[in-house]
């Protein structure tokens, strides 16, 4: 089955400009929002501007919800659940878009700062599935928070402004890399060697005796800078969450500017149109939901991951504010729901054709991707979407002229992966993975097609309105 290139729907002129305009809005978003906290904060800000009320405030007011009401629940500043209350009884199920807003990266350890041969470094622990060798010799930035004992929080964002310093992980020069070049790719760069070089000037002292007795003078100088500029000391790293991410803005990619290269397309290229689709929903038939979660890259665990009870609890609170609470009603609302697990898919790469089966893989320019199943080694660990549900989605997308394609994650036994789909499916929901195709997935700089992003937006809007 030959799928038409989605660009052909948008000839030069206003329609094509709409594609580029939405892509530019997204490019700016991922250029500034590089952590789950930053994404959640920006989405929350936009939601409030769009008339979404905070769920906790509605609970405190013992408010009564009605069709058309817009609600946002905030999960520790690392995830959100947005609801637009529908005309129909919520027991009939919700239309849910579920994406994650964390991305592969490196995190600073809790005791990160040390000195070696008069060079100051920060020790890191990588997060998610990464090719460690891809993270060396790159300009890197620090994003995150430092929470102090007095209750104040210092926001960290260093390396993005032109005048900011950047940081990096060094690599061995080719002239001395004979042994290194013989290693497997997984061992070329060891995880414990992903340490950031952050300084080399010793702390100043007018006392020569003090200079000789002072240990780790370069480290001391870095601590002086941190104290002067941020008001933090070394122990404050114990209660910090600082993420190491590629420095710099996302960029248009290609002579025709048809693509975007940026950090964190997985999964913000699905989270952004999911959120944008929610803003277009006013008074749906079924309650519409946009779920933006953390920790997907490490198994969706923890209080901010999909495996927590945050979403289920939020649904229970919504039903209570509708004046109809019962445990059975919560269970029915979840069981009867329909979900697009908005996560990325691997795009066919002409440089590496052998890992894909060409009839069942995703291509740039062919629109929104549906993955009936993911998993590995005989679909192990996958959510396998029902044929009846896929047929319904085909009709919706065709009725709304949404370009879409179907895909698997590589050839049989080639590898595999997973998403949050199976977790939501545990409630008995109809769930399928549906997102944007990505090149260089999990690399510091990933690539997507602008037209696929635009088709995702329209597909998500159609789903919320019609599913």
Model-derived regions: residue spans:
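N-terminal hydrophobic/helix-forming segments and targeting peptides
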Residues: 1-467
